[in-house]
Design a protein with these regions (language model features):
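Glycine-rich, N-terminal phosphate-binding loop of Rossmann-like dinucleotide-binding domains
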Residues: 70-72, 97, 149
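NAD(P)+-binding Rossmann beta1-loop-alpha1 motif at the extreme N-terminus of oxidoreductases
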Residues: 2-62
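Phosphate-coordination loops involved in phosphoryl transfer and adenosine-cofactor binding
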Residues: 7-10, 90, 142
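N-terminal Rossmann-like NAD(P) cofactor-binding module of classical short-chain dehydrogenase/reductase
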Residues: 67-68, 94
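Rossmann-like NAD(P)(H) cofactor-binding subdomain of soluble oxidoreductases
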Residues: 81-134
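Interdomain hinge/lid region at the active-site interface
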Residues: 210-280
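Internal alpha-helical scaffold of NAD(P)-dependent oxidoreductase catalytic cores
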Residues: 137-224
Length: 287
């Protein structure tokens, strides 16, 4: 391996939206030097006031031990492709994208020609809001971090993961879970993407416009993520279209059973369906 050029613990963040801004603020509060790049330069200037030490320029990239790709999937891939030759040997590059197959396949391939390591990551945290203004330093406190490591021997993998945990220590993640990109995308289609589709579709009922005075916790819970960043979620949904389409189909089939029982006024069948859902929820919580 060539001589490293990075400054220990220095962090570069690519994309200062909700996730990137939260990474930058957490690392800054943890005493780390943080540099950032964003497509909208005004956001970088805003972050320079109290969050970052400067812009992530071509001269700064080789000095970062950790680089976090926190933009949309294709933006992150394109940035890494352009800047791969500037990254220090021995540095670690991670992403924060909500799908893993597409980004890991391309970023692992980019990394193969260099002496730095790419590790796929997905912080399991967020809000229904987007943008740097809504980012916060405690966004990841106690949250799980899903990690998709590259193919390497057990010793090298353990070494990279220990370094990664150290570099992300200011973020306060509650756990680090190893997964393959394929398994991650299967699970996330159900636990996150389907929830956003359902919430977004649910508020399209005409009744939503007159809900005030008739809604409480269940309405609030189900509609929270109906408010979303449409361009970002479009890209995430289409990058995981096979898994998400399957989950939507499963849900449609399940809903049809409830509708059929209600249309038939079949109380016995309806009660059985409700009891089954209650039982499966309890089983899932015990795992």
């Amino acid at each position: 391996m060539a001589q490293s050029t990075y400054v220990p613990d220095r962090v570069g963040v690519v994309g200062l939206g909700l996730m990137g801004g939260s990474f930058a603020k957490a690392e800054h509060e943890g005493g780390r030097e943080v540099y950032a790049w964003n497509r909208t330069h005004a956001t970088v200037e805003l972050a320079e006031i109290e969050t970052i030490d400067g812009e992530l320029t071509d001269d700064v990239i080789p000095t970062c031990e950790l680089i976090i790709l926190a933009g949309y999937p294709q933006v992150s891939i394109d940035w890494l492709q352009r800047m791969a030759g500037l990254i220090s040997p021995g540095a670690i590059v991670i992403d924060a994208v909500g799908v893993k197959r597409v980004i890991c396949e391309k970023c692992f391939a980019i990394a193969e020609g260099h002496d730095w390591t790419f590790v796929g990551c997905h912080p399991m945290a967020g809000t229904q809001y987007s943008g740097f203004a809504h980012s916060r330093a405690n966004m990841f406190h106690g949250a799980p971090m899903v990690v998709v490591p590259p193919k390497m021997d057990d010793f090298d993998r353990a070494s990279v993961l220990e370094r990664l945990k150290h570099l992300l220590e200011p973020c306060g993640f509650g756990s680090f879970t190893l997964a393959t990109a394929a398994f991650h995308d299967e699970q996330i289609a159900y636990t996150s993407q389907l929830a956003h589709v359902v919430s977004n579709a649910y508020v399209k009922s005409p009744a939503a416009q007159s809900h005030k005075g008739f809604s409480a916790g269940s309405y609030k819970d189900l509609t929270r993520v109906a408010r979303l960043n449409a361009p970002m979620w479009r890209e995430l949904f289409l990058d995981n279209a096979d898994n998400l389409s399957r989950e939507i189909g499963t849900l449609i089939g399940n809903l049809q059973q409830y509708k059929d029982a209600i249309d038939a006024r079949d109380g016995q069948r309806l009660e059985a369906l409700l009891a089954e859902g209650d039982r499966l929820k309890k089983e899932a919580e015990r795992r």
